[in-house]
Amino acid sequence: MSAEKRKVAYIDGKPYEIGPNHTSILKFVKSYLGEKKVPTLCDDPNLAPYGACRVCSVEVALEKDGPTKVVASCHTPVGENQHIFTSNDGLQNLRKNIVELVLTDHPMNCDTCEVDKNCELQTVANDLGISDHRYNNPKQHKGTPKDTSHSYMLSLIHI
């Protein structure tokens, strides 16, 4: 019997074993460091990950102290010897910018929303320290009809 070689990737400098359920960097990080380590907006078990919102971006180097690349962790496969960085000033600024852009197309008066205090966007914005956005002229959404063409999406969209 030959023992299989353990496959390891590094999260913020610490080694972790890559398991069979670690199909993406996001799943890998969540399994060891919890749900909140990398923020997400479009991560949902009922949807295939495709990196649309980019809030889950992390930096990855293919070797220790090598050059890094920013990737969407939800759809980037975890690989042996990857060095994954979950938070730094650049990533925080990127995430804040993305969420601020999303907020420009979102009603800012959360008190009137039916999901106030139970809203993923509100939670991520608060976690990133966003209380207001710097982009002017947000859409007002007054009179905008809800898209009711699919029941699952209807349960996610609260305008």
Where in the sequence are the language-model features?
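Short solvent-exposed loop/turn micro-motifs enriched in small/polar/acidic residues
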Residues: 1-2, 67
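Fe-S ferredoxin-like electron-transfer domains
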Residues: 54, 59-157
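N-terminal cofactor/phosphate-binding cores enriched in small/glycine residues
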Residues: 16-70, 76-80
